[in-house]
Amino acid sequence: MPKRNDIKTILVIGSGPIIIGQAAEFDYAGTQACLALKEEGYKVILVNSNPATIMTDTEIADKVYIEPLTLDFVSRIIRKEQPDALLPTLGGQTGLNMAVQLHEAGILEENNVTLLGTKLSSIEQAEDRDLFRNLMNELNEPVPESDIVNTVQQAIDFATSIGYPVIVRPAFTMGGTGGGICHDEKELVEIVTNGLKYSPVTQCLIEKSIAGYKEIEYEVMRDSNDNAIVVCNMENIDPVGIHTGDSIVVAPSQTLTDKEYHMLRDVSLKIIRALGIEGGCNVQLALDPHSFNYYIIEVNPRVSRSSALASKATGYPIAKLAAKIAVGLTLDEMMNPVTGTSYAAFEPALDYVVSKIPRFPFDKFEKGERVLGTQMKATGEVMAIGRTYEESLLKAIRSLEYGVHHLGLPNGEAFELDFIKQRIGEQDDERLFFIGEAIRRGVTLEEIHEMTQIDYFFLNKFQHIIDIEHDLKDNVGDIDHLIWAKKYGFSDKVIAHRWNMTEKEIYDIRHENHILPVYKMVDTCASEFESNTPYFYGTYETENESIRSDKKKVVVLGSGPIRIGQGVEFDYATVHAVWAIREAGYEAIIINNNPETVSTDFSISDKLYFEPLTEEDVMNIINLEQPEGVVVQFGGQTAINLAEKLTKYGVKVLGTSLENLDRAEDRKEFEALMQRIEIPQPLGKTATSVEEAVANADFIGYPVLVRPSYVLGGRAMEIVYNEEELINYMTQAVKASPEHPVLIDRYLTGKEIEVDAICDGETVVIPGIMEHIERAGVHSGDSIAVYPPQTLTEKQIATLEDYTKRLAHGLEIKGLLNIQYVISNDEVFVLEVNPRASRTVPFLSKITDVPMANLAMKAILGESLISKGYKDGLVPYKEGVYVKAPVFSFSKLKNVDITLGPEMKSTGEVMGKDITLEKALYKGLVASGLQVKDHGTVLITVADKDKAEALGLAKRFHEVGYRIMATSGTAKLLKENDIPVVEVSKIGNEFNLLDVIRDGHVQIVINTMTKGKQIERDGFQIRRDSVDNGVPCLTSLDTARALLEVIESMTFNMNQM
């Protein structure tokens, strides 16, 4: 069927900021879809609030709106642009929910906008738990016994009738938000109360738990001619009960019999046909391991996290083809872009095994609730490809960057066996590693199966890995055993550990004996058709399919899995660097392991290696490809940390030299540089022991900022106010040593400023200066940033420009540079310098029209910035005001304190732009999910040191018509100053402030940290209850002031005559 000619302009809705449950996979899908629609001749208008994406680059769509994804703003864009059609199925849950809202508000009908892809009735049938259950009953397909509830009492009544445990699934949410498994009434009340709040239609499904069944997924596609295919089927190693986003997944499925595979395949195709979905769809099924009984768990009528994984696992570009299906093309008339010789209607075939492991944020949030359930907690994921299951699993494990390199924990032998068994039974994020440890200790597979319900197939594979370990130990130096271990994915590091050698010694033994990996092509067809995709994975076999070309090559290291502190911004920089390399006439080779991202789309680079970002795996590729050099400055800390290791092998690091990368990180060298170029920095010292830390802090004077050296995202960084807190930090948060010193700095309160620059060795281009709303002490990634700066003097701006140039020359920067400054008592100090891409690169590139990553890469390759039309110094400001606001995923992470500080906690970002600061801030806050209301109730409970400042804010809240609630101390101060206030009791009394928050009487909570970090602290409880009840909680008075300015700008002045 030919494509539709009755539509010319299509509006695509993006998925907004990165949050747990909705990550970089939608940037990948949206980018593919927009380009596919443009390829077919349509005019594409994109709306998305996330500036950190490739998708929001002006080249991707004909018109790009970076605006809040709310009914109000999307409606305005529809009225202005008058698109013919809307494609909502590429924007995750956000896109689907927006389509439903636009329909219900009459906006689509009023503006004659057609919905493409999946019909609204299909979306509602798949997403509304009641309609979905009814459809399954009509199809005679089994769903677990369930009921739809709109109140807590209905949930209690139903759960009592069918018996616990039950699973709660809120309607129209993603990542299992608000859901969970309940083992008793207490858990049910808590989870359903939350679930009803998070569901936009106040509806939850309560279903009989089938935890323990196998969880199987089918990624299916269908077109308007009713051609339907299975792109990929996947098996969760963790049985039903753990959200698929938090499960370890393998593709293709490993334990299904042919009968089971085809039974579930037929069911999946039957469901996509019944729903009438045109495009991609994900079907999740539960299979009884002991019979042919199965249940339908749910259907996602859109492109999803699983479809990104399926695309990368097979090479089959689901989002691209789904977009073309949406405009009427069919599978049997589109070529498969991978092979170029077969049609898209051929189902992909795999001759390898793919493993996906989630990446969790618990290295950031050590006190977070680690137990896994139906609510997702992972921020990202890694994928690895191997010829055996063992190989793909071990490659995935070493891609995680947790400090684990194998099936076990770094000091696993120190744990008691009882503790290991307890952790296996707890079903948390480290269970896989504890299973490895248990097998090492001789725990039987029967006992592990009993505790986990993990299929024996996988447990036997884990056993096989441990058996190979034992064989290695018993046969030190034996080449046959080395080859055998390499075939099953063992790294040189692990073999070196077993043989009591160094990793370099194993590397040398391999090279002497020609034990080298070959690279196989991912071609969607198991080599059945001719294919020339430049997409490879490494394995230890004989035939190498990756042929080295004669062109000059540059290798770019990607940034690995999405995690807090290292988000999609680094993938953005990586992609632009790769494009710049290709423009400059070099062959661009990328190494990365994240299935969600644009950088791992094989059409981006000349060659893609889907491999772990470790010394060994990267060196294997470099030895084969012989590049001019490697670029590390776009891949975040992941890539920077590899620079020194690669240099030892004689690899050339392109751009800023290793020596200068180290100079920016090494305390003493950096201080010497700062003195030489005469730039002030806060007084600081280094400590390698507790005693030295105490002495240094006494000399500097409290409060001090303490942190380990060489980290990203402010990991384990804290402000401490006295000796007791310092000792606590030194003994619990870090292990200081001569190799790993702790940095201790005077903590300066003042205005924080962030500057990004590009240098070619001579010219220093400064695209922009950003001013943070929150004063120094809040991590830059968690601050609201404003461009251009609103309160700086010309003298301060000139100083910032001068210091930035001095630093760029002093560090001999070639490429990018990011500097954080603090202005304290009108003096500019340097806080830190990062000689690499920063998380502000996409934001600044978009708002200044300076293609930062592209220019930096050209500078690295030796081109001058002047030849590109840029002058030395600060680029003239663009018109308007631009705000970058952080977005947090606290609602998904229990027991995590939301207080902002020097350690980063946000998962994503949004942008607001307008002609005034207040309007831009309004857009930024609304886009980040904050409901800005011009009236309501604000609860103020602050530390003593903040009371004087809070008084001024309270007065202004009162003047705009807000009611004020406060606890006794704050209330007393307000009354003394004639500000009306409702006093509420502290925690522990009847009807206290937690009741006020839980009962929905409060619209905003302002709570600043009272020292003492124990979880039981009242402050922690207030902040957690705010998050769990969907009430904005501001822990910085600067953020509160910004919000207040927005509310004031929305408020009319009411004065009596």
Curated annotation (Swiss-Prot):
Coiled coil: none
Binding site for Mg(2+) 3: Q820, E832
Matching InterPro entries: ATP-grasp, ATP_grasp_subdomain_1, CarbamoylP_synth_lsu, CarbamoylP_synth_lsu_oligo, CarbamoylP_synth_lsu_oligo_sf, CbamoylP_synth_lsu-like_ATP-bd, CbamoylP_synth_lsu_CPSase_dom, MGS-like_dom
Region of interest (Oligomerization domain), ranges: 402-546
Domain notes: The large subunit is composed of 2 ATP-grasp domains that are involved in binding the 2 ATP molecules needed for carbamoyl phosphate synthesis. The N-terminal ATP-grasp domain (referred to as the carboxyphosphate synthetic component) catalyzes the ATP-dependent phosphorylation of hydrogencarbonate to carboxyphosphate and the subsequent nucleophilic attack by ammonia to form a carbamate intermediate.
PANTHER family for the chain: CARBAMOYL-PHOSPHATE SYNTHASE [AMMONIA], MITOCHONDRIAL, CARBAMOYLTRANSFERASE FAMILY MEMBER
Listed name of the protein: Carbamoyl phosphate synthase large chain
Gene from which the chain derives: carB
